[in-house]
């Protein structure tokens, strides 16, 4: 099976693959060249996931702006 480009994966698939890549890298069992390839793939997956999150946030903002009664507040990932 061909490896999909990160931007063509769903958010969930990208995060799942990223988790797998991180686990493989953390194991320390990969030869250096393989580890570098996995690291590169992981960076691509993380960037694609972040882009999908940004797009989702923008869609939510647009939907909230369309509702005249809704108060729009900036998204802050650090709010707990």
UniProtKB/Swiss-Prot annotation:
Top-level enzyme category: hydrolase
Keyword Hydrolase: yes
GO biological process: DNA catabolic process
Gene Ontology cellular component terms for the protein in this record: cytosol; exodeoxyribonuclease VII complex
EC number(s) given by UniProt: 3.1.11.6
InterPro entries in the record: Exonuc_VII_S, Exonuc_VII_ssu_sf
GO molecular function: exodeoxyribonuclease VII activity
Compartments (UniProt record): Cytoplasm
Subunit structure: Heterooligomer composed of large and small subunits.
Summary of the function given for this chain in its UniProt record: Bidirectionally degrades single-stranded DNA into large acid-insoluble oligonucleotides, which are then degraded further into small acid-soluble oligonucleotides.
HAMAP family linked: Exonuc_7_S (MF_00337)
Name listed for the protein in its UniProt record: Exodeoxyribonuclease 7 small subunit
